A protein has these predicted regions:
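Structural detector for internal amphipathic alpha-helices that build alpha-solenoid repeat scaffolds
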Residues: 307-310, 332-343, 362-376, 381-387, ...
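The canonical Cys-X-X-Cys-His
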Residues: 243, 251-254, 296, 483-498, ...
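Gly/Gly-Pro-rich "capping" loops immediately C-terminal to redox-active cysteine motifs
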Residues: 499-558
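Short inter-helical turns and helix N-cap capping residues of alpha-solenoid HEAT/ARM repeat scaffolds
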Residues: 327-328, 359-360, 389-390, 423-424, ...
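Flexible coil segments in periplasmic/lumen-exposed cytochrome c-class electron-transfer proteins
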Residues: 467-479, 544-547, 551-619
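Electrostatic cytochrome c docking/interface patches
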Residues: 466-488, 493, 501-503, 509
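Beta-propeller domains with acidic blade repeats across secreted/periplasmic ectodomains
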Residues: 1-319, 330, 338-340, 396
Length: 619
């Protein structure tokens, strides 16, 4: 096990890695560009690269940059900011309606649902209601089981950023603070955990295992081990940051085994910020000196033998097909991916035969999506799958029927619409999603009937809400549209997509920006906070769990800050006029001498002075 090969060297912090046949796709820090590294001479070391998508720069806080890059069952590549359709080596990006899907890490299940997490917002499982590719509804308030948000840490070390501690229990973490590196367990070695989501929490020194249950018309998430955790340690240097369901069916996780894992922006070492005390504590404890001790663990179930790992690259396209039934999701995914990216249509007859003969629902779905990726999925195959005994296959077939539904196939439309009467909530919801996937005039009557017939479904109600939000966004002026993109990427994880703040226990992670007096009456001060940041999790005497607002003066220019302020002002606070880049430049000049983040006391003083200038009320 203790072997490694250096394939790519002399690069700075590669963040995303995805094997793609004989190439490896990589995204590096401070960039969104995707590079394909290759090894043309076959010596096991990359000898060149080519750009497959020019994403430009993405500088600033490394916590906010890209992660993920996974191949999904729908032949789409996902990361936390974009999903990329793949066709003959070309990538075409499309963003999410929520901006950023996840903070650090991305996972998928056998059905193609994508799972996100947020660190500062204390969320260890997000956005898992629908298969990837659809609008993402707001369901966090109704999808979590009792005590799901409570970590059961046994490490008594106070070194967190914003998680909060129970001091009656000797500084045991009481709120999730650093969720990351999630993966869905998809292995025949661990059938009891199949479909469960493992999420790393390096501040709590634990790995949470989440299980999902269909209840009351929604998929709810619960801690698999109530009152405890899947893996946890009292060792203060145990820092699990990444997990994978491996090709051999075993569970792997990466432990940085490090004293400090926080990047510098949220780890001040001098000044008046209350977090400087944390730096002083951990320095005194010697934690700054513990690094370069990382390790990878493999968890093998008792009395089980790891699965044999096939060398898929050496297999012919026809030889790949049986591996769609392999016991490891990792192997299944790569077999399907290779079938698609090779583009070898000679295997289409074999795939069609496999779809008819296999009794494995997951393998059947993978084969059908491989046929779609080869532009060879027949109508007859979809029709037959719509009548499959497995609801799981039916959902995939409805999803795959969209090409025919929106292409005018009335007979198939009638067959799919009839499935709205299914006893399975996933089937009913997929009927709704597939008919509403595009604004097709010929389907308007069916869409209207579904709006009425499925109106009581909880997820339909939430989906219609986000549809209305997208219609409203379409009417935004160009400045607000640009600001909405920045807001969703940067601000929503703490302040909420609706601007009303993200819940954390009985309070919020950060202040609500909706009908916010600072935005409405002192927009210059609010702009100054964006530029310089705020130390201390308090505003107007009210505490928040987020810790602090980082400075953005070196991340965004005046035009970008004007755009995000305009979006916040017009969307949440009834501004009548946009903020201009000239106004931001004036504020930037006014606070240039401010060398540290604003404290709550300094902000209150500015408010008493009626702002930085004599502000014009923007209401």
């Amino acid at each position: 096990m203790d072997k490694r090969t250096v394939f790519i060297d002399n690069v700075v912090l590669p963040r995303n890695v995805l094997p793609m046949g004989d190439k490896v796709y990589v995204i590096l820090t401070d960039s969104e560009t995707i590079w394909a590294y290759h090894d043309k001479d076959g010596d096991g070391v990359s000898d060149g690269r080519e750009m497959v998508w020019d994403g430009g720069l993405h500088t600033g806080n490394i916590e906010k940059q890209s992660s993920g890059l996974i191949w999904n069952i729908d032949n789409v590549i996902y990361n936390n900011y974009n999903r990329f359709t793949y066709h003959e080596g070309k990538l075409e990006p499309k963003g999410y309606n929520i901006g950023r899907f996840s903070q650090w890490g991305l996972a998928r299940d056998d059905d193609g649902r994508i799972y996100g997490t947020e660190a500062g917002a204390h969320e260890n499982a997000n956005y898992f209601q629908f298969p990837g590719g659809y609008l993402i509804a707001h369901t966090k308030d109704i999808e979590r089981g009792p005590e799901f948000d409570t970590p059961h840490s046994i490490c008594r070390v106070e070194d967190q950023t914003g998680g909060g501690y129970d001091f009656k229990k000797n500084r045991v973490l009481k709120e999730f603070s650093a969720n990351c590196g999630q993966s869905v367990i998809r292995s025949s070695l661990m059938p009891e955990f199949s479909g469960s989501l493992a999420t790393c929490e390096p501040v709590g020194r634990l790995i949470r295992l989440n299980q999902f249950k269909k209840e009351e018309g929604i998929r709810k998430v619960y801690n698999y081990f109530p009152g405890s955790e899947f893996i946890r340690s009292s060792d203060p240097f145990f820092r699990p940051v990444w997990s994978e369901s491996g090709p051999d069916g075993c569970f792997y996780f990466s432990d940085m085994y490090r004293g400090i894992i926080q990047e510098k922006e949220w780890f001040p070492t001098k000044g008046t910020n209350i977090k400087v005390k944390r730096y002083q504590r951990v320095k005194e404890w010697g934690m700054l000196e513990v690094f370069r001790n990382g390790r990878i663990y493999r968890l093998v179930p008792d009395d089980k033998v790891p699965l044999k790992v096939p060398k898929l690259l050496s297999k012919s396209s026809k030889e790949l097909i049986p591996f769609l039934e392999h016991g490891s999701g990792h192997v299944r995914d790569n077999a399907q991916k290779l079938l698609v990216i090779r583009g070898d249509k000679s295997v289409v007859p074999d795939l069609n035969t496999f779809v008819k003969q296999t009794e494995n629902p997951v393998a059947k779905m993978l084969a059908m999506w491989a046929l779609r990726g080869l532009d060879s999925l027949s109508r007859d195959t979809v029709v037959e799958a719509l009548g499959d005994a497995s609801a799981q296959v039916q959902v995939a077939a409805i999803h795959l029927s969209e090409e025919f539904l929106h292409g005018g196939d009335q007979e198939m439309a009638a067959q799919v619409e009839a499935m709205k009467a299914s006893d399975d909530m996933d089937v009913r919801m997929q009927v709704y999603l597939s008919f509403h996937a595009r604004p097709t005039p010929s389907l308007q009557s069916i869409q209207s009937r579904l709006d009425q017939d499925l109106a009581e479904m909880t997820l339909v109600k939430r989906y219609k809400q986000v549809q209305a939000e997208e219609v409203a966004k379409a009417s935004f002026d160009p400045v607000s549209k640009a600001g909405a993109k920045i807001y969703n990427l940067l601000c929503a994880s703490c302040h909420g997509l609706d601007g009303k703040g993200v819940k954390s226990g009985e309070g919020l992670v950060a202040p609500s920006l909706s009908r916010n007096s600072w935005i409405r009456w002192w927009p210059d001060v609010a702009t100054a906070i964006i530029l310089k940041g705020q130390a201390g999790a308090e505003l107007d005497g009210k505490p928040y769990s987020g810790g602090m607002m980082p400075a953005m003066e070196n991340v965004y220019n005046d035009q970008q800050i004007a755009e995000v302020m305009t979006y916040i002002g017009m969307n949440f606070n009834n501004w009548k006029e946009p903020m201009t880049k000239e106004q931001v430049a004036e504020v930037r000049k006014k606070v240039a001498s401010q060398k540290t983040m604003f404290t709550p006391a300094e902000l209150n003083e500015l408010r008493m002075k009626r702002g930085l200038f004599a502000p014009k009320k923007n209401k």
